[in-house]
């Protein structure tokens, strides 16, 4: 079970503390060659695995995948984990950890299956919990795509690269956490709105983004 960290009115679910730093650690490795985000590929990597990558993938992510013997191909079928996997894991943990209904659950759009699974579990007890997915307003970042295929009931909030960078710096300064840009943006949104933020993706994989800014 990953811990909560309170930040103002927000509760941060620290999925970046999982063994490979991502909420994708919670799902089994696909049995076929599929297309994944960089953090998904790092979580599901095994020796000899082959993946295609989608979205923004940093130098550090590529280097780690090479170190673990992962082969990267240009194209494969898109893949999204089953939300019910997250309902049974992430959602069950949230129900155990929360004593009252959160106003919302927010996470980057790349973790949309986790968001849907969490809502599936939480709404059995608290039907009015709002779901929020963050998408990129300008330059796509790891786990922060420009669009998503989530249901219309999920609110989409656009986050710019500069806003994500400020959120990352603030989370590091105030909480001592080295979070990803997308995870920090989710934390900052929940800090202003209340609710639960899913903070996934360790920040050490994204220093090259700051060097390129």
Predicted segments — roles?
Residues 1-213:
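PLP-dependent amino-acid enzyme catalytic core
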């Amino acid at each position: 079970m990953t811990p909560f960290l309170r930040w103002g009115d927000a509760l941060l679910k620290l999925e970046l503390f999982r063994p490979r730093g991502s909420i994708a650690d919670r799902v089994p490795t696909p049995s076929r060659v599929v297309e994944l985000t960089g953090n998904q590929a790092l979580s599901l990597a095994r020796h000899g695995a082959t993946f295609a990558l989608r979205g923004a993938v940093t130098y550090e992510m590529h280097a780690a995948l090479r170190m673990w013997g992962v082969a990267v191909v240009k194209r494969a079928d898109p893949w999204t984990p089953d939300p019910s996997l997250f309902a049974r894991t992430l959602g069950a943990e949230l129900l155990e950890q929360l004593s009252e209904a959160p106003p919302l659950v927010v996470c980057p759009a790349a973790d949309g299956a986790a968001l849907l699974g969490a809502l599936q579990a939480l709404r059995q007890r608290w039907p009015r919990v709002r779901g929020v997915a963050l998408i990129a307003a300008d330059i796509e970042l790891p786990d922060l795509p420009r669009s998503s295929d989530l249901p219309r009931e999920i609110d989409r909030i656009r986050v710019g690269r500069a806003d994500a960078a400020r959120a990352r710096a603030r989370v590091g300064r105030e909480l001592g956490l080295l979070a990803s840009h997308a995870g920090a943006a989710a934390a900052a949104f929940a800090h202003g709105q209340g609710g639960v933020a899913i903070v996934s993706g360790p920040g050490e994989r994204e220093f090259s983004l700051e060097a390129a800014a």
